[in-house]
């Protein structure tokens, strides 16, 4: 009887330990889930926590292109659609709930400039044509922007081929970003590290 009681107590302790471990794992998963492409998913809270440790760089693909959609154009046919502008505005509001302090940049195309403008709702925007050139030199260009921003967080509106290049080069994964998808990087000791894919919420 005593042996049975001891085994029962041990089993209860094991189950309690197992349940606690599952709760911890679930909590971690909610903060850092994994995308099907192999990149960690970083939500707003996780991004804010990362930004407390290092300057973060968030690179967004522009909103829906007018010239590749049947939806109504915002204005210029080389820019974004009305739907794209509204999506960018909603995303910007959600983003700013967690990250208020950042400098804003875009490449020199109408679609990225419009996307950044609607995302930020009045924040000052700096246009940099180097954000259109996406090869090995992209990292030096980003570091230059970080220095100009005095190591503040920065948001960059760029293009799908830039995000695809960075994901492949830094993590060896295939990333085919949709409109307004984004990658999160951070700067540490002059080096850039790819942390994952930004997922609002």
Swiss-Prot record:
Catalyzes the dephosphorylation of heptose(II) of the outer membrane lipopolysaccharide core. It comes from the Bacteria. Its EC number is 3.1.3.-. The keyword Iron-sulfur does not apply. Pathway: Bacterial outer membrane biogenesis; lipopolysaccharide metabolism. One of its GO terms (cellular component) is periplasmic space. One of its GO terms (biological process) is lipopolysaccharide metabolic process. It is an enzyme of class 3 (hydrolase). Pfam families: His_Phos_1 (PF00300). HAMAP family: Ais. It is found in: Periplasm. Residues 1-35 form the signal peptide. Coiled coil: none annotated. This is Lipopolysaccharide core heptose(II)-phosphate phosphatase. Gene3D superfamilies: Phosphoglycerate mutase-like. Belongs to the phosphoglycerate mutase family. Ais subfamily. SUPFAM superfamilies: Phosphoglycerate mutase-like. GO terms for molecular function: phosphatase activity.
């Amino acid at each position: 009887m005593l042996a049975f009681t001891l085994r029962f107590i041990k089993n209860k302790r094991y189950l309690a330990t197992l349940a606690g471990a599952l709760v911890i794992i679930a909590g971690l998963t909610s903060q850092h889930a994994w995308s099907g492409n192999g990149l960690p998913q970083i939500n707003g809270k996780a991004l804010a926590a990362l930004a407390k440790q290092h300057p973060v760089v968030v690179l967004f693909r522009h909103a829906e292109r007018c010239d590749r959609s049947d939806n109504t154009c915002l204005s210029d046919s080389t820019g974004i659609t009305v739907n794209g502008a509204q999506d960018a505005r909603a995303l910007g509001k959600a983003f700013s709930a967690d990250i208020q302090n950042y400098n804003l940049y875009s490449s020199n195309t109408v679609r990225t400039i419009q996307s950044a403008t609607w995302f930020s709702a009045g924040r000052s925007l700096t246009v940099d044509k180097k954000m259109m050139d996406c090869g090995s030199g992209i990292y030096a260009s980003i570091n230059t922007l970080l220095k100009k921003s005095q190591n503040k967080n920065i948001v960059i509106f760029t293009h799908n081929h830039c995000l695809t290049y960075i994901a492949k080069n830094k993590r060896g994964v295939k990333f085919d970003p949709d409109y307004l998808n984004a990658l999160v990087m951070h700067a540490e000791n002059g080096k850039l590290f790819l942390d994952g894919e930004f997922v609002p919420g």
